[in-house]
Structure formats: structure tokens, C-alpha cells
Amino acid sequence: MSSKKIVLTSSDGESFKVEEVVARKLQIVGHIIEDDCATNKIPIPNVTGEILAKVIEYCKKHVEDDDDVVETHESSTKGDKTVEEAKKKPDDVAVPESTEGDDEAEDKKEKLNEWDAKFMKDFDIKTIFDIILAANYLNVQGLFDLCSKTIADYIKDMTPEEVRELFNIENDFTPEEEEAIRNENAWTFEQDGKQQVPKP
């Protein structure tokens, strides 16, 4: 890892000293560094210290593990041969290359996915909303996707009314419009071959 440190300062004045390679995971910061606009402190105006700490924790873990996964995969593919090279000796039977490196990369990826799931379980839904806003602003795509999946899993069994309440969405349909929409999309409420049309 790079030894150069970058200080990120949150909207509420909290400062975090991080490795440059970690700071670059926040793409908005990466662009500042690439444009040589980075000073020893980079302000992050739309993110509180509490949320920035969580974003940095995610980025640190993914810098370490993403690098390990890439290195393992690259080392496992160095011995790969082209089809033409394999055909040069027609008397020899082509033996597939070892997939040990690929298996190791898969194991690391699986462990990283487990870490992601555990990381998200620590937060209530409001915190997840704050993190997804920060991930969007800072352009941390992996964290944004992880939060999106977590929210999708959270709301998948909710009724439309519960989702509206969670997201503070006002229902602008009349009862007649709601009924018409439910009837048009009745197939989406089928379970075990039986139609389950929820009541408004």
C-alpha cells in the first residue's frame, strides 16, 4: 500500500488520515488527487464524520481484499496457454491448467461478501440511507450497490403502504386508481398458483 497519507475532513469537522490508495476508492477524491488539486486536507462537505468513518472502513477492507483477489487471479492465469500453443504437440493430451489460484480468489471473494453482509447488519435503515447518500456523492460504486441490495432485501416483503411510510412517500392515487392498478397487475400477487390481491 502507498505510504502517502490524505486527510479527509467531514462536514462536521472530523478529520480522518487515510492511505492515498484508500482515499482513491472515493472516486470524487481520486479525481481531486489526479488533478493535482489535493492539499494535505480534502474537505468532504456533504458527509458527517459518523458516516464518513463507515465509508472509510468499507474502502479500507475493499482495498486490501480487492488487491489480494486481483493478485491471486493474475498469478493463476500466468501459465495459461493459447489454443494454438496447446495444438503444437498433437501427440500430447492437453491437460487443463490448475485452478488453484481461481479457487483461492473465489474463497477470498466469498469471504469479502460475508464481510459485506456482516458490515451492513450493524446498521439501522436510517444509517443505511445516510451511507447510500454518501456513497452516491463520493462515487463509491461498490458500497452504493451493497446498500441498494440491502435496502431491496429489506423492503421486498413490505406492502406498498409500508414502503410509502418508510420512504415518506405521499400516496397520490385515488382509491379507484389503486384498485385499477391492482387489477391490472394481479398476476404479481399470485402465490402457489392462487391469486392474492391485497386490499387497499
Curated annotation (Swiss-Prot):
Residues 67-109 are annotated as: Disordered. Residues 67-92 have a biased composition (Basic and acidic residues). Transmembrane segments: none annotated. It is found in: Nucleus. Coiled coil: none annotated. Residues 132-190 are annotated as: Interaction with the F-box domain of F-box proteins. One of its GO terms (cellular component) is SCF ubiquitin ligase complex. Expressed in leaves and flowers. Pfam families: Skp1, Skp1_POZ. The keyword Nucleus applies. Pathway: Protein modification; protein ubiquitination. Part of a SCF (SKP1-cullin-F-box) protein ligase complex. Interacts with CPR1/CPR30. Involved in ubiquitination and subsequent proteasomal degradation of target proteins. Together with CUL1, RBX1 and a F-box protein, it forms a SCF E3 ubiquitin ligase complex. The functional specificity of this complex depends on the type of F-box protein. In the SCF complex, it serves as an adapter that links the F-box protein to CUL1. PANTHER family: SKP1. Belongs to the SKP1 family. This is SKP1-like protein 19. It comes from Arabidopsis thaliana. The gene is ASK19.
